Amino acid sequence: MNTRFLDACWGKPVDTVPVWLMRQAGRYLPDYMRVRSKCTFLELCKTPELATEVTVQPVDILGVDAAILFSDILTPIEPMGMELDFTPGPVFAKPIRTMADVEALKIPKMETDVPYVLDAVKLLRKELATKVPLIGFGGAPFTLACYMVEGKGSKDFAALKKMMYADPEVYAALMDKITTMDMEYLNAQIKAGAQAIQIFDTWGGMLSPADYERYVLPYTQRLINGLDRTNIPVIHFVKGAGTMLEIVKQAGGDVMGLDWHVNLGKARDILGDMAVQGNLDPTVLFAPNEIIEREVKRVLDENAGRPGLIFNLGHGILPTVPPEKAIFMVDCVHRLSRK
């Protein structure tokens, strides 16, 4: 098996910088669209054989150094008692607004409530045995709460922030319950065979540093501390957190995910020995090849040869990116960083 990705997570020497892409199993790949055309998004998430097929596609097509389980961060929320649909974005029929709503949420039994996730992990470990490691993942408690309270995607998640400020007891009870669920969900993935875990906090960066520290940090910290992490690296990605890396670092984990709004070298100075993942602007993949190569080189140069770099985009690959551009980017990373 290619262990570059895991070695880099632990800060060990590698022959070339490992690379994978957030949303690498996705709509930009014709092979993915072929599978997706036959089922709904939720059916794809809930059918282990199909989830396995699309998870492996980018490993074979792009030559990336890790696979990430095909699923959705909201998958474990449905069995908590919230009706979920995708139209095409996530929509909850009845958002959480009151303490009674929070009390009605149940903690799922992972083996019986989301068996398809764990079955996909087990299938993937067999499928990827001679290829690359498998990353399991989940949403951070705050980002999950954003969707559960708002009921759908939003630019500002005003309903959640209103709860945070005006109903702190309800907010705390909700975050506490989500954190407990999240811990059990990610530990179930680890038990099923996930070799690394990524925690996505897509909306954590919309808060001020003081609010992040007060309303988010304690829950993410508790989540990470509660994971069965023996030899399992944890990647913590908070989009938009470049101005508060010192605070986010306190949550724990082994690798800090970075978006493109921060200079990777300066981030490394702040984070010390902690490994990092990132941080190319996803829209660079629409550029001519020479620009892609220039930008890959810039990120590598900012790292200045320090161990513990996993190359990635600063957020998910966009659906309209030509696959050959992603292939070229992966090749650039390997070629330009080869020892």
Curated annotation (Swiss-Prot):
Subcellular location: Cytoplasm
Main localization, broad class: cytoplasm
Binding positions for substrate per the UniProt entry: 23-27, 72, 147, 202, 315
Annotated site (Transition state stabilizer): 72
Superkingdom of origin: Bacteria
Pfam families: URO-D (PF01208)
Entry's EC annotation: 4.1.1.37
Similarity-based family: Belongs to the uroporphyrinogen decarboxylase family.
Name of the protein in its database record: Uroporphyrinogen decarboxylase
Originating species: Citrifermentans bemidjiense (strain ATCC BAA-1014 / DSM 16622 / JCM 12645 / Bem)
Organism lineage: Bacteria, Pseudomonadati, Thermodesulfobacteriota, Desulfuromonadia, Geobacterales
